[in-house]
Amino acid sequence: MNQSYGRLVSRAAIAATAMASALLLIKIFAWWYTGSVSILAALVDSLVDIAASLTNLLVVRYSLQPADEEHTFGHGKAESLAALAQSMFISGSALFLFLTGIQHLVRPEPLQAAGVGVVVTLIALFSTLALVTFQRWVVRKTQSQAVRADMLHYQSDVMMNGAILVALGLSWYGWHRADALFALGIGIYILYSALRMGYEAVQSLLDRALPDEERQDIITIVTAWPGIRGAHDLRTRQSGPTRFIQIHLEMEDNLPLVQAHVIADQVEQAILRRFPGSDVIIHQDPSSVVPAAQQGFFER
């Protein structure tokens, strides 16, 4: 799983870096030629895109390193750190947009050769749409937090490019403050995306439990197994591509140890079939030693 995961996530990061680099060169020319503050906003965002995607590429490769003596649970949390770093980069670019937009709102300037800006923005819009489509497919296959953060960033780019087209069109017809107003609006949206991304990264670093539907799937698997009277203390978290699942199973007091082990092993394999690559720890408890207040999800 890790090989397939690493290959897909690396390809997504390489594709994002290559596209952002190409668009950066085009946007530098377009900004120099038109003087559009919205295109300048997109140019700055492309710089952030390159830095973020390169960070993703390096971090993903590091996160896939096997566990060692100092990192016995692996290096998957590096992905969450990358997402947190991205949120900081993006927040910085949003603040830059605010300052630039306010400056041009106070002192509006007519655009030069707005048609060039429209062509460049259309190229950026369709290129970014293609990248986001590919990233969404990678996220669906891998659930990578780093790629999901990158995808959210590029989704904001799609919104940005659409807003730039409208701003350029309005400025073309004499509404020169529209360029600055849209830059401010874009900055607000980017800042919102950055805060949401940072929140998700922090939750992962704090070992937030798996989603409710995944925990319910685990409970469903356990409840379907004969020989298990109950279950409690389900604890879950995720680090990179790896889910960590711990659960206590309640069994008959007089069940032979070997048979209890076989049942627990079968349950573990069933969980792994549902969540491949997970780290599963199962503890077996005689049902009589479990206090009533701790008895868990069901009782047969």
Swiss-Prot record:
Single annotated GO MF: metal ion binding
UniProt binding sites for Zn(2+): 45, 49, 153, 157
Catalytic activity: Zn(2+)(in) + H(+)(out) = Zn(2+)(out) + H(+)(in); Cd(2+)(in) + H(+)(out) = Cd(2+)(out) + H(+)(in); Fe(2+)(in) + H(+)(out) = Fe(2+)(out) + H(+)(in)
Cellular component GO terms held in the UniProt record: plasma membrane
Transmembrane regions: 24-44, 82-102, 114-134, 156-176, 178-198
Highest taxon in the source lineage: Bacteria
Keyword Transmembrane: yes
Keywords assigned by UniProt, alphabetized: Cell inner membrane, Cell membrane, Ion transport, Iron, Iron transport, Membrane, Metal-binding, Transmembrane, Transmembrane helix, Transport, Zinc, Zinc transport
Function: Divalent metal cation transporter which exports Zn(2+), Cd(2+) and possibly Fe(2+). May be involved in zinc and iron detoxification by efflux.
Quaternary state and interactors: Homodimer.
Family according to the record: Belongs to the cation diffusion facilitator (CDF) transporter (TC 2.A.4) family. FieF subfamily.
UniProt-recorded name of the protein: Cation-efflux pump FieF
UniProt source species: Klebsiella pneumoniae (strain 342)
Gene name of this polypeptide: fieF
